[in-house]
Every structure is written in C-alpha cells, then in structure tokens.
Amino acid sequence: MFDIDFGILFPISWEQSPIFLAVGLIFAFATLSPWLRSGERLINGREGFEILWTNAKKRYQTKGRSVMEAGFSKYNDSFYMMTDSGTEMVLHPRYVDEIRNDPRLDFHRYMKTKGGEINRDLIQTKLTRSVGRLIGSISAEIEDALHNRWEEGEGEYEEYLLVLPPAEMHTEWHEIVLLSVMIPVVAQGVSKMFVGDPLCRNKDWIGMILRHTRSVQTALRSLRLWPYFLRPLAARFLPTCRQVTAEIEEARRIINPVLEKKRAEKLAMIQKGEKPPEPNTYMDWLEESDKDEFYDPVVAQLKISMAAIHATSDLLSQTIFSLCDSPELVKELRAEAVSVIGAYGWGKEAIYNLKLMDSVLKETQRLKPMQINLTRLALDRIKLSDGTVIPRGSKVLISCHNMWDSNVYPNANQYDGHRFYKLRQRAGMENSAQLSTPSPDHLGFGLGMYACPGRHIASTVMKVTLCHILLKYDFELAEGCTPRVIEYGSFLLADPTARVSIRRRKEEIQL
C-alpha cells in the first residue's frame, strides 16, 4: 500500500526540532551532510550555483524514475540519490532476498510511524481472517456506491460526471473522470471493514477521509522540500499542514460519538451478564487490542483509510485503462465472473477462482507499481554478501526495476493480462503467481516481513469492484483521451484527469 511519512504530521511536537542549535551550524550541516555521506556516488546533486538542496529535491519529484535509471546505468549495484526525504542509498533488486527479513533494516523507522506493529498485527491476524464472511457486505456497499456515484452523480465528486438527467445516465453513454469517481466507491467498500455501520455510508465520514487523503499528500509535498530539522517547525505554520490538523479534529467529532456509543452498549451488556457481540471491524479490534501510549483510534482509522483507499483506487483505475484497450479480454473476464460467482456466490472460493482477473490485476501492477522501490532504515552497519556496505542510519531504497526486465518476464514491456494466469498453470506456481503473493520478481506489495499486510483485503475489494463494473457497465476511453502515468518521485500514479465513457448494461447474473 501507499507509503506515507506520517511521522512528521501525526503528532508534531516542539521537542523534535533542535531549535537551540546555532543557525550557522545547522546551515552547514544541511548543505554539506548529503555530500559528505554519499561522496562521488550521489547521482543527482546540486547544479550551477545552488547552495541548498531544494532544487535537487524538486528535480527528483518530477523525474525520480529517470534519476534512478541514470544511477543504475552508471553504477551497477548501489549509489546515492537526493530525494525529497533526503539522501538515500539505492540498491539493485538483486539484493532483495538479503534484506527482505533483516531486522536491522526497519520499515517503520524509515516511515517514522508509531504503533505500526500493532496495526500490522490486527490487519494480518484479525481483519484479513474476517474478510471471507464480509465479502457479501462489501459487495453491497460497492453496489450502492457505484449506483450513487456512477449513475446518479451523487456526492462530492459529481463535478466529474458529464451532466445528464439521472434516468439517462442509466442507459446512455456518459463520461466520468475515472480515478476521481473510483475513489469514493472504494472508500465506501473498505469502510465497511474499517468502521462498519453506520459510518460506512455516512457522507460526512466518507467526504472527510477523501479530503484528508488529498490534504496529507499536499502537505507532505510541501513539507519534504524543507530541511528535515525544520519540518516540525514548518508543520506548525504551513497552511497545508494546519489543514491536516483541522481534519483530524473533524474526524474525532465524527468517530468519537460512535465509539462512545459502542463502549456504552458493551458495558451495559456486561453489567447485565450478557455476552457482547464479537468484534467485526478494524475499529472494534482496535478497541480490543493492547493499547499503549500511542493509541489513538481516530488517527489509526485515518492512516489505514488513506493507505487502502489511495492504493486500491489507483490500481483499479489503471486496470480499467488497460482493459479499455483489450475488448476481448473484457469478454473473457465477464465470462469468468459469471461462471465463478454463479457457482460459488460471494465467498473465499469465488475470490480465489477469479484467476484471470487476478492475473490482470497483477500484470497491471507489474507494469505500473505505485512505488518503484522498497524502503528501509538501517539500524546498524550492514555488510552484504558481495561486500557492499550499508552505513548505519542510512535510508535505503531497493529498486523494483526487475519487474520490467525481459530476462525476468518475456516481452516485459508488453501488457499481457494472461501472463500470471499462465504461470499459475505451472507446477509449483499456483500460489506464487497470485496477486497477493509477493516475490523477488514482483514487488508491487513489497516483500518479506514488511510486505503490505492489507494485500489480501485489497485483492478482495478490487475483485468485487471489478465484477460489478464488468457485469453492469460498458466502458471505453473517452474520445481523444490517452491516459498518462504520472511520475512523482518514486511513485507512479494513475492519471487523475483521464476520462472514461460508461453506459449501464444488463448484468448476466445478480450480484
């Protein structure tokens, strides 16, 4: 899922900023430390008469993939790169097996998150195991959201729909800005698992988490251009960061009454000698978890919602863009959905047996992963098998460019929706070629001890959503529209402006 540096936004304290250091010493450290650490192996330094690293960071933000490609063309194994997070050591993907489970390379410390281990455990041991019994409920939310957003033009994103009377929107072709209309659909679907009823259909909650996702991304873009030691101070005054803080308080006003009601009902049942209902949502399991000083149920909900909604909507939208160029593949996917859902209904068996759909999603993610590297912080000095040294305290990026290597995947630059479906037919690859199974050759969901804990949930939500879209809508790219891949630093994002024409069709089976 989407990696977000929450540590500089939630929470912010004056103690984080070394305000008592002399200004001259700070300035010297900020300007010289990247060069001192990386030496000649810094691939993208300052240019001309630049003193600070701000412009180098901006160049990385707009050309991150090109900078990384230039680094590997000059240095085969490792080099340093100035990113918007500072100087980072970049490693070739051949090292991924060495670092995947090394506890000295820490993802949470890189992201500066607190309580991440608790959230990961809850997602893996509680939420993922409950998905099977929630699939029918998730489907109902997706169905409701698609009807309201794609057909009725309801809600915050109605400006992204071609204006038509609601009746005609059921039968006539009309345009949508796909990503912008996909986001609230996914938000309602995942909220069923995260907060449950009634919040999953609460327009204030859905609208708030959508706005908050945009606000956090905007705040981080501006904040990362500041020297690290000044970020806590800048976050106090930048309007974008103040907006994030205001939205957290708005989230508290929405969630806290629901939490208080749940707590009161549970206490009343216990006092009567009755057994409270079993936890059924992420919110419930957070309440049941061992809480520490970092426990904040509202911030926890915002974090998981942002990560899940953004990444899932992005991959779904990119998949639809790819399918617009493959009408025969669309027919095959529809036939598979009719066959599988008709045979199994909504359950784990259905999700597992949507094998072509699984392959299509995995191939889309292979060609356009949301992030082109894995991230870690070195807690100690580490010497790799070939003698390469990772200095203690280094931020480390492991490149994912092997996913586009024709030595790994034949015709790697071509989209082949059947690629992983065929691989699953090979002996011993039934599981390894699945979307939710990371491997050294496919790092879309990370790898090892820090692989995305919500990947099984994301896979389920995407398959349910695609089934509804495929069976209920005809779709094609809007006239004159060619979706782009938006590059931002290490991220590859689906085109947020690309338009798709859709029309309601009669589904072959009831979902």
UniProtKB/Swiss-Prot annotation:
Primary localization class, coarse: membrane
Pathway linked to the protein: Secondary metabolite biosynthesis
Location within or outside the cell: Membrane
Residues carrying covalently attached carbohydrate according to the record: N76, N373
Record keywords: Glycoprotein, Heme, Iron, Membrane, Metal-binding, Monooxygenase, Oxidoreductase, Transmembrane, Transmembrane helix
Cofactor(s) needed for function: heme
TM ranges: 8-28
One Pfam family per UniProt: p450
UniProt KW Coiled coil keyword: no
A GO molecular-function descriptor: oxidoreductase activity, acting on paired donors, with incorporation or reduction of molecular oxygen
Disulfide feature: none
EC number: 1.-.-.-
Binding site for heme: C452
GO CC annotation, single: membrane
GO biological process: secondary metabolic process
Bilayer disposition of the protein: Single-pass membrane protein
InterPro entries: Cyt_P450, Cyt_P450_E_grp-IV, Cyt_P450_sf
Function, as annotated: Cytochrome P450 monooxygenase; part of the gene cluster that mediates the biosynthesis of the indole diterpenes nodulisporic acids (NA). Nodulisporic acid A (NAA) and its chemically modified derivatives are of particular significance because of their highly potent insecticidal activity against blood-feeding arthropods and lack of observable adverse effects on mammals, in particular the tremogenicity associated with the paspaline-derived IDTs is not observed.
Family: Belongs to the cytochrome P450 family.
PANTHER family referenced in this protein's UniProt entry, alphabetically: CYTOCHROME P450 (PTHR46206), CYTOCHROME P450 MONOOXYGENASE AUSG-RELATED (PTHR46206:SF2)
Name the record gives this protein: Cytochrome P450 monooxygenase nodR
Originating species: Hypoxylon pulicicidum
Higher taxonomy: Eukaryota, Fungi, Dikarya, Ascomycota, Pezizomycotina
